[in-house]
Amino acid sequence: MAPSKSIKSVVICVLILVLVLEQVQVEGKSCCKDTLARNCYNTCRFAGGSRPVCAGACRCKIISGPKCPSDYPKLNLLPESGEPDVTQYCTIGCTNSVCDNMDNVFRGQEMKFDMGLCSNACARFCNDGAVIQSVEA
């Protein structure tokens, strides 16, 4: 019976990561002129504004490709932020939201093994899927 719980938790982790990856690929990305424009866009979207309205009001563009135009470079909110920071933030967020929830549902010795697999899956997801030039809209 114990291996059954172990397999279930790994399957749940993989399914959640696949769903997140599919959503990331479908959505457009926003590129902003500078940090002030990025903050404006994020605030507008958080308040419920649509992507086109917020992009127009905040000097940003919605793109469908993986890279921002050179005159719209801003992904990072802080000038000193870079790819390692983004990857680490992604990995921590994935681990906290996916793996920790699995830990709350299933307890036991095999869960420690599953948590390791889940953490590795998050690291692979964030390292392979990190795109620095743009951010999800």
From Swiss-Prot:
Compartments, as annotated in UniProt: Secreted
GO MF term (any one): toxin activity
Proregion residues excised on maturation: 75-137
Superkingdom of source: Eukaryota
Keyword Translocase: no
Biological process, per Gene Ontology: defense response
InterPro entries: Thionin, Thionin-like_sf
Entry keywords, A to Z: Disulfide bond, Plant defense, Secreted, Signal, Toxin
Bilayer-crossing regions: none
Family from the record: Belongs to the plant thionin (TC 1.C.44) family. 4 C-C subfamily.
Protein name: Leaf-specific thionin BTH6
Protein's organism: Hordeum vulgare
